[in-house]
Design a protein with these regions (language model features):
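Bacterial N-terminal signal peptides
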Residues: 5-16
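Short coil/linker segments at helix-helix boundaries
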Residues: 21-48, 58, 69-126, 133-175, ...
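Solenoid-like repeat scaffolds
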Residues: 54-55, 202-207, 221-224, 253-261, ...
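TPR alpha-solenoid repeat register
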Residues: 62, 130, 179, 230-231, ...
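Alpha-solenoid helical repeat scaffolds
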Residues: 201, 231-241, 270-278, 300, ...
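Flexible, glycine-rich surface segments
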Residues: 216-274
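Terminal, low-structured helical/coil segments at or just beyond the last alpha-helical repeat
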Residues: 222, 226-228, 250, 300-327
Length: 327
């Protein structure tokens, strides 16, 4: 009897150890992939995410990361982002030039992530990780529909589903702060709507608050795990919308320091500082330090030989815009 118990204990220990090893490898690949992604190295990012898919084909994490990388790359390469960076204008102006092959690839990975998450939830409706990835996949689906395809009703439906699933996550695991990202963003968006539109969506059971939305995103930015930097990227622009220019600049500085190969974060610092300088001048406050920082950023980027020609042209465009605003 003791022999059987020892064998069973050994099998259990082996299975547990293997599962822990696999999760550790998945976490490492995910971290490496996101570091590459935020440094605009899409090839390396997708290489790591593909390895996640191969290592754990039944786990929705890999497909969801693949979909996220395609979404961010599409936004970075779109003409809206080239003119407004990560601003909310990228979600409200003209139509993006969508790469059909990339769009099909995006849908494939979103579909796969949702299917895998739903399969796990059929076995265990309280599987927190599966609920999170289902909501995260719906969240990136909403972002693609709004930011890339301009299909706002589709975005609203997917976004609402994402929020519902992430609320379920927080009921089961209150400290799962990554799940607050979609909820916080939806709160801010709905809270920012004109009153008639806000009243309309309220009839659908959707309500929001800018203040509450910002608080949730700030919590993700400080206490989240995988969604921490996504929250920071969002907060840069939301702070600018709130005219909190110094907060926006500092958040962008932190991102630029962490991801030095991402020139967009450096341009975000300059953009926030330019707006801050305009406001300070109106208040007749000193602006010398901020002006110097803006000049240093553009000087550094203009001499950066790692940037390609289109990026250099973008830097020149942003510099000309900044100079006009600061005259």
């Amino acid at each position: 009897m003791r022999v059987i118990a020892s064998i069973l204990l050994g099998i259990f220990w082996t299975i547990t150890t293997l599962a822990q090893d696999q999760q550790a490898r998945l976490d490492t690949l995910r971290a490496e992939g996101y570091e590459a992604l935020y440094n605009l190295d899409y090839g390396t990012a997708r290489n790591r995410f593909q390895k996640m898919v191969e290592l754990a084909p039944d786990n929705p994490a890999g497909p969801q990361c693949m979909a996220s990388s395609l979404w961010l790359q599409q936004l970075n390469q779109s003409w809206q982002l080239k003119s407004t960076l990560y601003s909310t204008g990228a979600y409200t102006e003209g139509k993006a030039q969508v790469d059909r092959k990339q769009a099909d690839e995006f849908r494939k990975w979103v579909r796969r992530a949702k299917q895998l998450a739903q399969a796990r939830l059929r076995k265990d409706p309280h599987d927190v990780e599966a609920l999170y990835f289902l909501g995260a996949s719906e969240g990136v689906e909403a972002s693609w529909a709004a930011g890339v395809e301009r299909k706002f009703m589709a975005a609203f439906r997917a976004g609402t589903d994402s929020v519902d699933h992430h609320r379920e996550v927080l009921k089961l695991a209150p400290n799962f702060h990554d799940a607050e990202l979609t909820i916080g963003l939806m709160n801010y968006i709905v809270g920012s709507l004109p009153l008639p539109t806000k009243m309309l969506v309220a009839t659908m059971g959707v309500r929001g608050s800018r203040k509450r939305g910002l608080e949730m995103l700030e919590r993700v930015a400080t206490e989240g795990k995988w969604a921490r930097d996504v929250a920071r990227v969002l907060l840069v622009d939301l702070y600018k919308r709130e005219k909190r220019f110094e907060d926006a600049a500092q958040m962008a500085r932190d991102l630029a320091a962490k991801y030095p190969r991402n020139y967009l974060f450096k341009l975000q610092v300059a953009d926030a500082l330019t707006s801050q300088i305009v406001a300070l001048r109106k208040a007749k406050k000193p602006v010398i330090a901020a002006e110097k920082e803006v000049q240093d950023i553009f000087a550094s980027l203009s001499h950066d030989k790692t940037l390609d020609t289109p990026t250099r042209e973008l830097v020149n465009v942003r510099w000309n815009i900044a100079r006009k605003e600061l005259q």
